[in-house]
């Protein structure tokens, strides 16, 4: 369903993919461009229309505009769109998350339509947000699309399983080496390998930015390459460009927190980025972890405080 777009506007078998620009924009994080293109094109058949709508609504989710998705996807929509709606419901309604996961568990216990790539991706996204990476990986393992493999690589790298991520990347390269998703996954793996591979990762992010547009996803990728190479000043320039595009983007703010520490900036600078992150994303895993560490520190400090 939501398979990877190639580097040129041709799908498997060499036929033109009329949704290439929509998919490509979505994959590199140019969500508004994906929305604009999805609203402009007239799909040639109902299947393509559904696929276009999947990318349209996933782009709205990426912009945190959950209301648009919940208002527009009705109960009689296709299974693919129902899956997108399920993810929007999960993200928009914290009090209902446990119930949504329980319902998803029941669906996964029955026979799942593995041809519905969108369902697998949305289910895996819910499990991963719910801190259950094993369930996310099990779900994705049932799919064969480039997007399922790319998401598996992201999760495996977060679990420090570079060995398994490299195996998945090899599968992606065998399926379509030039696909946008394969190129992105190559950059993520190179970033994890480090050393001289960091420059290769940087060039992939840079080439995509030059060819398409310099998105927050690509800029943060470039900044991560610079930081891993100890090029802190170069990283600052790229992150500043990202911050100018969106002053509340969580990954940019987290990278600025790390960067300001390494550049020896005053503590208030780091605290400013943390405050911005708390304001815009109070439930972000980084903030929750940071606050847990603060509480641990306060508790330890109390233990060692001099008694009056």
UniProtKB/Swiss-Prot annotation:
GO terms for biological process: endoplasmic reticulum to Golgi vesicle-mediated transport; intra-Golgi vesicle-mediated transport; protein transport; retrograde vesicle-mediated transport, Golgi to endoplasmic reticulum. Its main location: cytoplasm. It is a peripheral membrane protein. It is found in: Cytoplasm; Golgi apparatus membrane; Cytoplasmic vesicle, COPI-coated vesicle membrane. One of its GO terms (molecular function) is structural molecule activity. The keyword Nucleotidyltransferase does not apply. Pfam families: Coatomer_E. It comes from the Eukaryota. Keywords: Cytoplasm, Cytoplasmic vesicle, ER-Golgi transport, Golgi apparatus, Membrane, Protein transport, Transport. One of its GO terms (cellular component) is COPI vesicle coat. Belongs to the COPE family. PANTHER family: COATOMER SUBUNIT EPSILON. The coatomer is a cytosolic protein complex that binds to dilysine motifs and reversibly associates with Golgi non-clathrin-coated vesicles, which further mediate biosynthetic protein transport from the ER, via the Golgi up to the trans Golgi network. The coatomer complex is required for budding from Golgi membranes, and is essential for the retrograde Golgi-to-ER transport of dilysine-tagged proteins. Oligomeric complex that consists of at least the alpha, beta, beta', gamma, delta, epsilon and zeta subunits. This is Coatomer subunit epsilon.
């Amino acid at each position: 369903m939501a398979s990877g777009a190639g580097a040129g506007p041709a799908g498997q078998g060499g036929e033109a993919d009329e949704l290439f620009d929509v998919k490509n924009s979505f994959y590199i994080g140019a969500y508004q461009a994906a929305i604009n293109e999805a609203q402009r094109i007239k799909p040639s058949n109902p299947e393509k229309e559904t696929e276009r709508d999947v990318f349209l609504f996933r782009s709205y989710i990426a912009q945190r505009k959950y209301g648009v998705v919940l208002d527009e996807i009705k109960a009689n929509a296709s299974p693919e769109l129902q899956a997108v709606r399920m993810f929007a419901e999960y993200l928009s309604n914290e009090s209902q998350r446990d119930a949504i996961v329980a319902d998803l568990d029941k669906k996964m216990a029955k026979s799942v339509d593995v041809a519905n790539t969108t369902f697998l991706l949305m289910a895996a996204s819910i499990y991963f947000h719910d801190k259950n990476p094993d369930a996310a990986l099990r779900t994705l393992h049932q799919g064969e699309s480039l997007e399922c493999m790319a998401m598996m690589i992201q999760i495996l790298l977060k679990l420090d399983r570079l060995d398994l991520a490299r195996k998945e990347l090899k599968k992606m390269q065998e399926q379509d080496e030039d696909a946008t998703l394969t190129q992105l996954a190559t950059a993520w793996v190179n970033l994890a390998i480090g050393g001289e591979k960091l420059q290769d990762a940087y060039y992939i992010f840079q080439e995509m930015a030059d060819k398409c547009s310099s998105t927050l996803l690509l800029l943060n990728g470039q900044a991560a390459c610079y930081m891993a190479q100890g090029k802190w000043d170069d990283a600052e320039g790229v992150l500043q460009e990202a911050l100018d595009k969106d002053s509340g983007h969580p990954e940019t703010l987290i990278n600025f927190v790390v960067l300001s520490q390494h550049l020896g900036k005053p503590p208030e600078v780091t605290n400013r980025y943390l405050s911005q992150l708390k304001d815009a994303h109070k439930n972000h895993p980084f903030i929750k972890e940071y606050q847990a560490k603060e509480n641990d520190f306060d508790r330890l400090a109390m233990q060692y405080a001099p008694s009056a």
